[in-house]
Amino acid sequence: TATDDAIAWAVNNDAKVIMVAPCCMHELQTQVKEAPEPWGMLTKYGLVKERLVDLVTDSLRAQILKLLGYRVDIVEFIGGEHTARNIMIRAVKTGAAVQSLDKDRYEKMVKDWNVTPYLSKLLSTKLKAAADIGNI
């Protein structure tokens, strides 16, 4: 997706700061066939499922950046009255070591939702390298 391509380009070019307003959420939408419980209660409603999976997508993007040594936050950058898609992912490269809890949470989320984020494919070498040196 365009957002994942932009994030991967920034990471691969050692960007110190990354700011993206994510679009292109459909990749995980197609992967989620059945939500882990108790989330199935929400995902049985099409619109709610779409919005929830959008949030899962952006949360996984943020977590991948965190695993690669970025301090990350997700903020609203335009009021909700203008658009429902008003999230910005902000990341600053710190190189800080990652806590094992962060890795565990990412792995559990991917496993529970049975998804493979496109960004993780694009950055698989860097994620593996971070794991090999003990950063993950």
What are these language model-derived features?
Residues 1-136:
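Class I S-adenosyl-L-methionine
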